[in-house]
Amino acid sequence: MLRFTDEHEWLRLDGDVATVGITAHAAEQLGDLVFVELPKVGVKLTKGEAAAVVESVKAASDVYAPLSGEVTEVNEAALSDPASVGADPQGAGWLYRLKLDDVSAMDALMDEAAYADFAK
């Protein structure tokens, strides 16, 4: 299940763990990424809390926790190569994995069609 937020994050659910990243739209708006800061594994995040930072030559932008849960993994490759996040934001450029407190909360997020309309 793939879902999107109005803060331009995407989530892909596998069991009760969601992989989180920025959308292609967000990556395009930011331009070339030069720095990525990710949350620490084991940290509990609350929906809406700043979880990560992506910085481009244009601007720095917070990435908010789309749902509440515990960080189980971070994309180390994104730390060493921030450009990979912009090059493949919804694939190899994922940011972190979040074990969700409530999987059913995914239902409140936008599906791909709704996000495409939102991002126009």
UniProtKB/Swiss-Prot annotation:
CDD domains: GCS_H (cd06848). Its cofactor is (R)-lipoate. Binds 1 lipoyl cofactor covalently. The modification N6-lipoyllysine is found at K58. Keywords: Lipoyl. Coiled coil: none annotated. The keyword Isomerase does not apply. Residues 17-99 form the Lipoyl-binding domain. One of its GO terms (cellular component) is cytoplasm. InterPro entries: 2-oxoA_DH_lipoyl-BS (IPR003016), Biotin_lipoyl (IPR000089), GCV_H (IPR002930), GCV_H/Fam206 (IPR033753), GCV_H_sub (IPR017453), Single_hybrid_motif (IPR011053). Belongs to the GcvH family. This is Glycine cleavage system H protein. The lineage of its organism: Bacteria, Pseudomonadati, Pseudomonadota, Alphaproteobacteria, Hyphomicrobiales. The gene is gcvH.
